[in-house]
Amino acid sequence: MYRVPEFYARRKRLGGQTPYLMDQLGLRLGMWYWKDETRTLEFRRFAAEDSVQWLLKHHPHFTPAAEVKEKGKKGKAVHFAETDGPASDRLTDKRLAAKDDKSAKAVEKRGQQGTITLDDVKFVTLLLLQDTEMQRICSFTTFMRNKNLDNFLMALLYYLSHYLEKNSLEKKPKSYMVGLVEKKEMELVLSELEAAQRYLAQKYCILVLGLAVPDKHHMCCGKEKISDTQKDWKFFESFYTFCTYVAWIVFRRQHLTEIEEEVGRLFRTNMFNIPRRRREDEESGGEKKRMTFVQFRRMMAKRPAIKKAINMRSPVMSTLLPSLREKAQNVFEKKYHQVDVRFPAEMQKHVGTLDSVPMPVVGILGEPRCLFNPHTLHPLDPEENTKSFGRYPSLMENNNMRIQDTLDLVMKTLSSHTSCPK
């Protein structure tokens, strides 16, 4: 009887026991390969037959009687390309350049879409002030995305829009007989200006108290026992400058002197109003004249004492927290300057609805981005600066419509009273 060779029997025993032994020992045969999708090395486990063939092929004590046919490998071969050569550097540079061009074009295309927002104006202002006010503005950059800052800036812009409208009405040529329309128009603007100043005072008090920005407060909202006046001074000086230039850019880079003086008047007392002093020096010719002792005493008499100057309040703060003297002055003005005009109930209701009409878009806010340079917010068409708010209705037009409606109601009321039989 033909005897089976020993090495063949041992090979068969090993072939039957290999999967079991491998599972018992926790060993797994397979192959590592590079996966392009995830750019990682991954392990692919062999099947039972493949593992037996690999073991027989690499085991030193056994040699197979016949060569085992190798099956096609399912995994991809690992290829490592050299990245140190100049060709690879050029290829990488080309890819990065093409990617940068595409991203720049995409950003520019996105930048031309939509409308101008307050964030656009804030960042343009910050870039504008980096050259001249770099030291003070750097401490202000962390405050840029604060919601309370946005609320305050919008309140300031609404106030300045009414203020500029009032100035334009005052500069209009006046006739000898001021009509009812002009009086009513000025009354509407003044009432809206007063309401806007009250709203601005509320938003300003939030910033002064440091409710949302304790790190900018001079006493860290009570966490510190000593007032850091230097930090407080630097922050608010940069803050006033920033607000002035935001308003200047929003109003198409016009009326800078008027905006600067009004911001200085609102948030500073007369003693510390630097723009006002500068204007007075320019009006006097800029020359320091020698004064006599009498003239010096007269000039100093106009200025308050130091104790009084410390407790003085800016016009914005006195709107919500007036002193006793300011309260008495307000009562006196309301008593003698209030116009005693009484309208019918229907007319008062109609006037109330007219006053609740929201104000139109302020300056360039809300206008299409494609009309402006995205880096400076200059209008691409120079004639746009001469136009008053373009296609959007101005505050003057709205006021004229409201006045005309009021006058129509007055005429209807008077005609109904005169047509009644006696």
UniProtKB/Swiss-Prot annotation:
Keyword annotations of the record: Protein phosphatase inhibitor
| Listed InterPro entries | Pro_pase_1_reg_su_36
Gene Ontology molecular functions: phosphatase binding; protein phosphatase inhibitor activity
The record's PANTHER family line, in alphabetical order, gives:
PROTEIN PHOSPHATASE 1 REGULATORY SUBUNIT 36
* Protein's job: Inhibits phosphatase activity of protein phosphatase 1 (PP1) complexes.
| Quaternary assembly | Interacts with PPP1CA.
What is the protein's name according to its record?
A: Protein phosphatase 1 regulatory subunit 36
Organism, by scientific name, is Homo sapiens
What lineage is this protein's organism placed in? Eukaryota, Metazoa, Chordata, Craniata, Vertebrata
